[in-house]
Amino acid sequence: MAPEFESGTKMATTIQKSSCAYVTFLAGNGDYVKGVVGLAKGLIKAKSMYPLVVAILPDVPEEHRMILTRHGCIVKEIEPLAPSLQSLDKYARSYYVLNYSKLRIWEFVEYSKMVYLDGDMQVFENIDHLFELPDKYLYAVADCICDMYGEPCDEVLPWPKELGPRPSVYFNAGMFVFQPNPSVYVRLLNTLKVTPPTQFAEQDFLNMYFKDVYKPIPYTYNMLLAMLWRHPEKIEVNKAKAVHYCSPGAKPWKYTGKEEHMDREDIKMLVKKWWDIYNDTTLDHKAQGSTVEANRLRGAAFSDTNISALYITSPSAA
């Protein structure tokens, strides 16, 4: 159940507290649940005013559901969604096919606006101001920072020609701001039926579908670890508000430091920061009125971030 807030608490926006939420996705009975717990605790530490909804597939065991509930998450079961289970060889990794199920979150119409975060992300600063972004657009961070400025780069992912013209900027689907909408949800599903599977699954699909309403936002809202060695001159790790541990060997709960790039000092520091949050028992969810909840209410719901400053003018398509 979503936490209730004191009616006297004022906010720096007209958005209703109950109408917004963060959302993530979880499948299977593996240890990814640790990532979601870490994310939930990170949002508490950042004094977010909004709950974390976890969209789970039916194969998530009851034990993991109870863990999520104990940490204050709103658990919502969804049905799997995939264009074809017979085309697993089309994906960069076979399990990417599960990620099409993320499209179900457009059906969460009890929320007017949501911020999607992958379960292997961690939030280090309050990002509630993202809910203030103007409606009717999808906001996300470019998958490669060079793409934001139209600079040629070997690290930019190849665009599947079968999906039509390449978007001017290709975003990473590990974090995005969107509005649930039943009409959009139906159109997404209908479009998926006639869209061939591609290497990066739902990420390619979302880039194709939302190319006309996509707005880039700064890398600080989804700092991919690979940017630290691909484009170190463009990255300031201490400015990252949310970090995406998506590189091979980077999942903090599996980290050994043995995979390529994982022995870097900045990676070790970010893994430690994740564990510091995960192991902090003062961030464990408690009932309303607890110290944690009181701190969330006292914290600023929105930072002093200038919302208009988030917009990055994307280069025109070639």
From Swiss-Prot:
<dbReference type="GO" id="GO:0005737">
    <property type="term" value="C:cytoplasm"/>
</dbReference>
<feature type="binding site">
    <location>
        <position position="118"/>
    </location>
    <ligand>
        <name>Mn(2+)</name>
    </ligand>
</feature>
<keyword id="KW-0464">Manganese</keyword>
<feature type="binding site">
    <location>
        <position position="244"/>
    </location>
    <ligand>
        <name>Mn(2+)</name>
    </ligand>
</feature>
<feature type="binding site">
    <location>
        <position position="120"/>
    </location>
    <ligand>
        <name>Mn(2+)</name>
    </ligand>
</feature>
<dbReference type="InterPro" id="IPR002495">
    <property type="entry name" value="Glyco_trans_8"/>
</dbReference>
<keyword id="KW-0963">Cytoplasm</keyword>
<keyword id="KW-0479">Metal-binding</keyword>
<dbReference type="InterPro" id="IPR050587">
    <property type="entry name" value="GNT1/Glycosyltrans_8"/>
</dbReference>
<dbReference type="GO" id="GO:0071465">
    <property type="term" value="P:cellular response to desiccation"/>
</dbReference>
<keyword id="KW-0119">Carbohydrate metabolism</keyword>
<dbReference type="InterPro" id="IPR029044">
    <property type="entry name" value="Nucleotide-diphossugar_trans"/>
</dbReference>
<dbReference type="GO" id="GO:0070417">
    <property type="term" value="P:cellular response to cold"/>
</dbReference>
<protein>
    <recommendedName>
        <fullName>Galactinol synthase 1</fullName>
        <ecNumber>2.4.1.123</ecNumber>
    </recommendedName>
</protein>
<comment type="similarity">
    <text>Belongs to the glycosyltransferase 8 family. Galactosyltransferase subfamily.</text>
</comment>
<feature type="active site">
    <location>
        <position position="102"/>
    </location>
</feature>
<dbReference type="GO" id="GO:0046872">
    <property type="term" value="F:metal ion binding"/>
</dbReference>
<dbReference type="GO" id="GO:0006012">
    <property type="term" value="P:galactose metabolic process"/>
</dbReference>
<keyword id="KW-0299">Galactose metabolism</keyword>
<dbReference type="Pfam" id="PF01501">
    <property type="entry name" value="Glyco_transf_8"/>
</dbReference>
<keyword id="KW-0328">Glycosyltransferase</keyword>
<comment type="function">
    <text>Galactinol synthase involved in the biosynthesis of raffinose family oligosaccharides (RFOs) that function as osmoprotectants. May promote plant stress tolerance.</text>
</comment>
<dbReference type="GO" id="GO:0047216">
    <property type="term" value="F:inositol 3-alpha-galactosyltransferase activity"/>
</dbReference>
<dbReference type="GO" id="GO:0016757">
    <property type="term" value="F:glycosyltransferase activity"/>
</dbReference>
<keyword id="KW-0808">Transferase</keyword>
